[in-house]
């Protein structure tokens, strides 16, 4: 934050005519070309090893093209200074975000240190020219420099009237990984001596040694450690701890040592010509655009179509020129609470580095109010101007030099979820923005924070972090360690908070997962069973924590040097993946009345409906409370794991050697299923409920363990003999179960299974209708690949409906549709739509089958693919729009051609991921369905695509 406070500063001659209201004599480009810099005669190229460390695409830092300046028809250098600018906030594509905002602040009359921005188009021309400055550009840069010199009454390289500069990159989109800032450019021995005569030796030579460090590292790629070694050795030899304790004499000596480091590393002396320094810095910024880290950042974030980076050259101002100077950072509103009050820090007689290094503790802004009342009043006025102008909370950096305020930067301020919602609502109430604009001010991640518990003070536990895994499900959890699902349920029944620690979870663990306050797994990715189920329930989860070793037998987990046994306290941060020792204090979800107001605006705008994935009445109620417009996916197989009695009935059905015995088990399951459906219909009174028929492979209902234990348990539960049980297990075993005997294939082979589930749905719907509940059941057939498969199941379902309706003498409306999760189904969607009244894309399996990735095994290679830029996102987290997305669009278009009123949506994990939701909205889908806890996030994403 404060590191950049010192970036934009200027040294002015005491008593100079550089007053607040000073304006340039001319903003127009001069028709006479600026003189060529003296070093331009030095031919050719600076050695390519100057950029080797950053792996720059344009490795040589070339000298200025030795040619007469050529007039260009397109402007490439834009000036800015108080009251007048050649750019504005709308020119981010050309000036970069930083340059556009500097120009905007200057144009509305704020005191901005003057400077100029070299456009992104110039960077593009530089790249196109094979990393050589385009003809005429250097003359334009020198022209811009002369404008700044006239504005400030100071000259680059003049010891009597020294002008120092900062040089910074700035693309249209904020891009960490670009070139760092170069400060104090323009210093050499003569200028440092002149500066020392005016402002003191210590200040001058501290600035010089900082410049040598930054220029050497940032521009010439000399390892910073080489400079730091000299600094540390100097402090040790003097018995000092802090940089500020060094004397002027010490700093002078360091300057000499830093020059020796430069000479040794580059084989040539440090360039003393200030214009040569400026040239090399500009080239370094241009080259940084093609650095590996910048290209990787653009690839990962899908940033395309940009011309390059702009170069911002700005005069320096200093906050460390005595007790009438200082530096600070502030937010125009509290970024934690949203309160309309300035929130920030200020340091007297300091530069930003002092804050970053922790050398001094910053003071509240009230300190500035007391010490520099005139500058403070101007700062408050500027904050009000900027908020009204940008219509957003601003993050502002400023410096006061000898009682004069300089605005260094403004940008939209980062904030917490609670603050984001309050600021959006307050600004509408203040008449500053309209509701549609306010919707854009809150990020989906902000709502995620509001819907989960958080730690009171994350910085307080940093020394207690003992491992870090994947942040699989956000929020915070504090509980006592348990190692089995049964123990988690038992502890929960006793009113204890349990953290379930497993090597990995399975469907049989769902009871314990639901009972636990948090889940920690040794293995598994962001789409593992633990992660997916945790997100459905809004449970905090840290998965794939390779730094832990779980020992179920002894009920202990080893985390580094720590061994935790059952009952010991552990805390999890599901938003960061941190595993924290002990019992850390929690604060409840920060829900407020502002959130309801904000979400009402969201719902007024969006067209895409948002439903929820819910398997129990409690889930359904949570979904409804979070604004779900129905249930888009109710997984019937999850109901079977709800109790020992249910799982035994399922196993009896699986093991039954005859239809008669299988039907007996199904009759028991009918009672359970009917009761569950009644509860869900009741909770969703008046809203549609989509129930998916059994999808799990049969083997997932079998006990875990070695074959002898499985056989023994099955025999005890079902009455089968060991030989029959073993034969049945062998028959159920599959080489690739996720592509095997599951979904509609179960219902086709065992039609009585589909009949039981359909009967439970219709009987529950009739019972609830008789109680005055409005019921809209929709039955979804899973894993369909051909229209014949769907036709088989639809016929069975409609036959059951007719029988149930005839028995009770009453009918209800219902729909039968299918999941589109097999690529073939998407390709023949028109044929399938003849049988289906709705499509719901199961994007989890559709992604799995389209990529040929096993979801259970992607953790072995996806991280490598992401690290190498082969994939930009994990396709199980963020929809693959080019591949899977095209299948979604194709199937939707084909399906609606065959059935124009076809309802289409999705019910995979992507239904709660903001960029995926935006894609589905643009693709014309009718709904998305997601975890109950992500419903507000999907609602917001669906609205933001329209504003």
Swiss-Prot record:
UniProt-annotated binding residues for substrate: 635, 692, 821, 842-845
Tissue localization of expression: Isoform C4PPDKZM1 mainly localized in mesophyll cells and only a low level is found in bundle sheath cells. Isoform CYPPDKZM1 expressed in roots, stems and etiolated leaves.
Modified residues annotated as N-acetylalanine in this record: 63
GO process annotations (BP): photosynthesis
Record GO cellular component, one term: chloroplast
Enzyme category, top tier: transferase
Entries under Pfam families matching the protein: PEP-utilizers, PEP-utilizers_C, PPDK_N
Oligomeric form and interacting partners: Homotetramer.
Stated name of the protein: Pyruvate, phosphate dikinase 1, chloroplastic
Biological source species: Zea mays (Maize)
Taxonomic lineage of the native organism: Eukaryota, Viridiplantae, Streptophyta, Embryophyta, Tracheophyta
Gene name of this polypeptide: PPDK1
